[in-house]
Design a protein with these regions (language model features):
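Positively charged, small/polar-rich N-terminal and surface patches that mediate targeting and assembly
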Residues: 1-120
């Protein structure tokens, strides 16, 4: 089973936490980890920029890449946000199974378009 680690930076810690909560609720990700605020340095509009940002580490399944990207782009305040999808070389079988179960409707099918598993 494959698992993706998705790296996203965000300027607002509270908005970033709301974003992660939304993504977990919609089963686009199994979990998200918010790293403490750090400093990013980059060129934008021809000049060096310095921004305080939190880094999000999101775990998902490859089938959710497109809907996850769309949702992040929809909610993110940046014109060009950092969204990096990294395929894990190796993941323990139990963790991969948990990620898949957390990102699916329980039948192995992704719920990537925002479907949330309803009552059984």
């Amino acid at each position: 089973m494959r698992v993706d680690l998705v790296v996203v930076t965000h300027p607002d810690p509270e908005a970033a936490e709301r974003l992660v909560s939304n993504l977990v609720s919609r089963r686009l990700i199994a979990c998200g980890h918010l790293l403490p605020r750090g400093t990013s340095l980059f060129f934008w509009d021809g000049s060096l920029q310095r921004e305080g940002e939190v880094t999000l580490l999101l775990k998902t399944i490859p089938e959710n890449r497109e809907p996850l990207e769309k949702e992040i782009l929809r909610e993110h305040p940046y014109q060009v946000p950092e969204i990096l999808f990294l395929a894990a070389d190796h993941v323990t079988a139990a963790y991969a199974a948990w990620v898949r179960e957390s990102c699916t409707a329980g039948d192995g099918s992704p719920t990537g378009e925002g479907g949330v598993r309803g009552p059984a």
